[in-house]
A protein has these predicted regions:
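Generic structural motif recognizing short loop/turn segments at the entrances and edges of beta-strands
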Residues: 63, 142, 178-181
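A sequence-level detector of short, solvent-exposed, charge-rich linear segments
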Residues: 40, 75, 111, 127, ...
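Gly-rich Lys/Arg/Thr-decorated short loops/hinges at beta-loop-alpha junctions or inter-strand turns
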Residues: 2-7, 31, 138-145, 156, ...
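Terminal amphipathic helices with adjacent charged low-complexity linkers/tails
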Residues: 100, 104-158
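Conserved catalytic cores of soluble enzyme domains
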Residues: 1-124
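Weak global preference for isoleucine
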Residues: 29, 65-66, 109-112, 130, ...
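Non-catalytic terminal/interface segments that mediate subunit docking, oligomerization
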Residues: 149-183
C-alpha cells in the first residue's frame, strides 16, 4: 500500500500479490504435499497461502482468518463482532476455507504430522505400506445392515468406512464442510 509509505512507492520489484508468488505455491503443490496451520490471526496474502494447500488446520483457541478486524467491522457496519465470530474455526471449517479445527497449536502440529504420515518420504517414493493383521478371509457382517437394499435410502457412510478401513487408518479432512462428501 502506498498509503503506508508516506505517499512514496516502496522500492520493491512488484506488488505483493504478483502472480509469481502464487505460481511458486502452485508448483510446490504439484510436487510435494503442502500442509498449513493457522495458529493466530491470519489476513491478506498469508490467508491466501494458508488455503492454497492440500491440508489446512486452524487452532480453535488462538486462530482467526479475517479480512478486517472487529474495530473496522464496527465502524463500517455498526456491528460488534469478535475475531472468532468474524473468522474463527467454527466459521471456516463450516464454509470450507480450512479442512480441520484442532484444540490448540500442539494439536495442529499433530494433525499435520498425521496427514503427512500417509505420504511418501519424497516425490520419487511410493506411499508407506504397513502390515495389516486383519484376516484375509474376514467378512464384515455389519455392512449387510448398514447399506440398505433400497438405493434411494440414505445411510451413514462413516460406518462403512469404519468397517472397511484398517483400524485407526482413516484421517478425515473437512468434516464440517459439505455434508454429502467424506474426504
Amino acid at each position: 500500500s502506498v498509503g503506508g509509505t508516506g505517499g512514496k512507492s516502496p522500492n520493491l520489484p512488484g506488488p505483493v500479490n504478483t502472480p509469481s508468488r502464487f505460481r511458486s505455491v502452485a508448483q510446490a503443490m504439484a510436487t510435494v504435499p503442502v500442509a498449513t496451520a493457522a495458529m493466530g490471526a491470519v489476513a491478506g496474502l498469508p490467508a491466501g497461502r494458508l488455503v492454497a494447500s492440500h491440508f489446512s488446520v486452524m487452532s480453535k483457541s488462538t486462530a482467526q482468518i479475517i479480512t478486517a478486524g472487529p474495530a473496522v467491522v464496527e465502524r463500517a457496519m455498526g456491528e460488534k463482532k469478535t475475531k472468532d465470530e468474524l473468522g474463527g474455526w467454527k466459521v471456516h471449517t463450516k464454509n470450507g476455507t480450512v479442512d480441520n479445527g484442532a484444540d490448540d497449536e500442539r494439536a495442529c502440529i499433530e494433525e499435520i504430522k498425521r496427514f503427512l504420515s500417509f505420504m511418501p518420504d519424497h516425490v520419487n517414493k511410493l506411499a508407506p505400506v504397513i502390515d495389516c493383521d486383519d484376516p484375509v478371509d474376514r467378512c464384515e457382517e455389519s455392512l449387510l445392515e448398514v447399506v440398505p437394499r433400497d438405493r434411494r435410502v440414505a445411510f451413514e457412510m462413516r460406518k462403512v468406512i469404519k468397517a472397511v478401513f484398517d483400524e485407526g487408518s482413516f484421517f478425515e479432512m473437512g468434516k464440517g464442510y459439505g455434508r454429502s462428501q467424506i474426504t
